[in-house]
Amino acid sequence: MFKDKSTAYEVVIAGGGLAGLSLALQIKKLRPTTSILVLEKREHDAPAATHKVGESLSELGAYYLREVLDMKHYLTSCQLRKFGFRFFFSPEHASDITRRVEVGSKIFNPFPSHQVDRGKLENDMAEKVVTNGIDLLLGARLTAADLAKNGHSISYEHNQVPQTVSSKWFIDATGRNSFLKRKLQLQKELDHNINAAWFRLNATIDIDYWSDDTQWRSFIAPGLRRLATNHLMGKGYWVWIIPLVDGPTSIGIVADPNYHPFDSFNSFDKSMNWLHIHEPLAASILEQYRQKVMDFKVMKHFAYDSKQFYSSDNWALAGEAGAFLDPLYSPGTDFIGLSNTWITDLVTRNLNGEDIALRSLVFDHAHKQLFRGWGTVYRNMYGLFGKTQIMLMKLIWDWASYWAMPNLLFSNKGYINLDVMKFYASTNGIGHRFALLNENIQLLFRSWGEYETEPVCDHQLNVFDLAFLKRLQSEIGEQYNREDLVSKMESNMRLLEKIVAEIFRKVSTLIQGTPPDMDVDPYKINLESQADGTHMTTGGPNALPVDHAVRADIEKMWFQKVKARQNVSI
């Protein structure tokens, strides 16, 4: 796979996993003459169903692989089409899947995503890398990276023989033990202490067969539930069930140690015991395949950040070499697509003779801000996962905001368009408003969690019965010129403001007894009343009246009728 004996490259990428291979392909596609060397420490092809998190693609990551890297045909023919995300709440009915609130679609999502076997995907991408004239060296262990503005010196060992090459650019895609991050002391702690354990079974696990209730089964066509990324949700935890293309199934437990100590599930036997306690039906099914366990892995306190991602001194961190948040909603490949797109833009412009000093600063700041905003989706939220009504509203917001803004910007190259980014990041611009809306409503969910709410069960919900969610998902990938993109961003922001206002009305009426039709400023939502009994959320230039179409959609997932009682323990 290593064709050239060159000692000088324009780009050296350390790490031949998904991030490194896709970056090499993206750079080569945009600038075909670029000389690239990829160094990968594993000596052979990755095994099928290889032991990595990241089997489930969300829409942004799927767009990156399908459209940016031209892998649409490959993903359609060689991997599984994903039947979206599927959530099973109501943990009080963990022994009966038919009693749990089930949320997902009844048809394949309009914009497709996939379940991928990471071993197969990376092996096939490695072949594509070589076919495209990129040098890929397996069994290469990085030993040193001497960085200099006028050129880097990269040292590695191959077959126990020291080698050195020069490069104009050095990209670290070595994963969470990032060589470059340690060298430059860029490690940054993240206040999100969550642990995970996961294993693969050489067996097909189909939730359709967890009950013989024909009415429950018939909610969707046979076989489709299995193709979803299925989530079993409970207080302080979630469990994933993900199918892989050749038959195996990935099972994972992700939990907050404030509720579920890491040592209660940090071995396979402990994981099964934990499942018997918290997800007894799932445990009884999985017990039948105990002899078909392919592997087991744990990851303690998996979230981390970086002080910097990109530099005009011609280095960058790609994928998990930079930062990692949380596997919920499968954002891993999203961030690979985002970071690789920023890196590709910097590399190709620099190699073409352009000054990238400003762009590197803008992209680094954008990555940090996006990562910080994304973090509010997860931080201090695990205690709410067993509160079904809260989570239904959170799902609405998390899906709507993700499809309305990051997907729109990414698919239209907005994140690498300085004109668009200037508009997005301007004072009180869309970026600021988007971040503030997200922070406010995530805080609302946490505040709501301090109140007891009625248990919700016995509902099967089609997410695309909500017209605005169906529209936002179906619009992913639509292309706009600069003027129309800005207009679409504004339009989507107005919708998001209405969603926040309506969710707040429902919650405030439930908890505080406020009028259900009051005007609401979505940027000032607060469950606490002022001294005179009024609410700061009402009135002002940003206050919104009820939007009856948005209200009708949200009411399809609203089941609370009794006023909530305060209970500070969540």
Residues of each region from the PLM?
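Beta1/beta-strand and adjacent pyrophosphate-binding region of the FAD-binding site
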Residues: 4-19, 37
